[in-house]
Amino acid sequence: MKQLLKNAKLYDGTGAEPFIGDVLIDGDRIAKVGPALADEADVVYDLSGKSLSPGFIDGHSHNDWFAIKKEPLPYFEPFIRQGIATFVAGNCGVSTIGFEPDSPHADKLGGGLFTYQDTTGRYGTLDEFFAAVDRNMPCNLSVLAGHCSARAAVSGFANRKLTPEEETGMLAIMEKALQQGAAGLSLGMMYEPGLYADVEEQRKVAELCVKYNKPLTVHPRAESKVSMAYPQLFGRSHLLRAFDELVEISKNTPLKLHYSHAIFVGRSSFKDKAELLCLMDELRKTGTDVTFDIYNECLGVSVITVILPGWYQGMSVEEKRKPFNRLKLAALVKATSLLLGFGFKDIVVAYIGPGYERFEGKSVHQIAKEEGMSDLNAYLMLCEASDFKGRVNMGPYSTKEIISDFEHDEHCLYMTDAWVEDHGVQNPAIYDCYPKFLRDSLLGTGDTMPNTVRRMTGAIADRFMLPERGYLKEGYFADLTVFDENMLRAGVPDREESFGIEKLFINGTLVLDGGKLNEQALKTTGRAIRVK
């Protein structure tokens, strides 16, 4: 079927100035782009006064875990309403792929963030995963192979250096994924078991990416001035030390290093922004290709254990409860909180588990007062109640000023880093993260509109080498987002709904039209994207 979209303001994904023109869709491809195309189509849409761009791409996603749900649409719907057609998933070291199905540690996969509950199965290789999801999900998906998943497959959550045999097995798993079309690899240095990897292990993962000329995305070991990642609470910022590790593994190499979610946890960390950007610039001078991404929120979502030191997480429950270990932890947490400008008042419970709904939406400090215990004891109670798998919303991670500065940085890409939860408080980024970037541009706090559109389309497609996506080009897949700039400018953010997005085409199929979803079509519109 041929569809003609006429008289729209066209943003082509390159960062060039927009122009009034038409786009002809033939089947799942863009057939023509230009002014005043002939009305030789089965369906014609007059988009006068509207804007049209390539379908948005979420550059940092975890929706590989939701593409295999038995009913995936509810997990993709809010993103579709933001105009997002494609996801780069498998981030933070925690991917659905990259393990051996007969691994004795298969129950460890998911890193405490995700599970295989209500899914169609487990798929250890990329080939198996793509065979299961291609044309069987709402949106397009490319996948990174996660280091945490591969490490867990060979050694579980063991807090130790891998044996030579284990390391060889882990690297073989990741290399196989790259050969089968993974978009790259990901490290999650703040999550088990990735946090147990030393610099040499990280370097070997990076070398694989160099070998296949694919990106390495990294959730760094620390994202704050002080943390539980390093023993010294004074001196160099932990956030900067964590980046020093990345310098060690990539300096003087052509690695495509992508720093995930540039955030600064705690008010004392905000001043590290300038030096972090300087370090990135210095690393680029050695030949390393460094980029980073952001979401348009000042808070973030994480596992409840994210503030616990590795030595404590590696203990048994009985060891964790020993008085000496509790005292040691308490002293460390108190000192960290004072130095960081971040405390239990800033940690809000999103989900603990059945029977604990009364805690959702409350800070740990508030819960401690209600339960008549110390903040730390309340926090550890919540950790144990959730089997150390609870979910929290934390902030501040950033400021509007920092976000605005990053929006003007040529190396910055956009993403949501959000997913739909079955229970508890949702991450606000699932609703309107991308409309807020567009709104920033229209209100003058963000980059220009052409560059803003590029950061969520062509630039991401380029970074992850997504074939025939991200641009308004003849022969490319017809992923197209239609938006209303007046509605975006006047939109009210943070209301648990999107705004300003009019239509979304995925592979030539109109899946969102004036707020109405084409639910039947969305069962099969999504494609698996292999990167060669």
Placement of each model-derived feature along the sequence:
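N-terminal metal-binding scaffold of metallo-dependent hydrolase/deaminase domains
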Residues: M1-D39, S48, T452, D462, ...
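Active-site neighborhoods of metal-dependent hydrolases
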Residues: V133, P138-F157, K161-P164, I173-Y191, ...
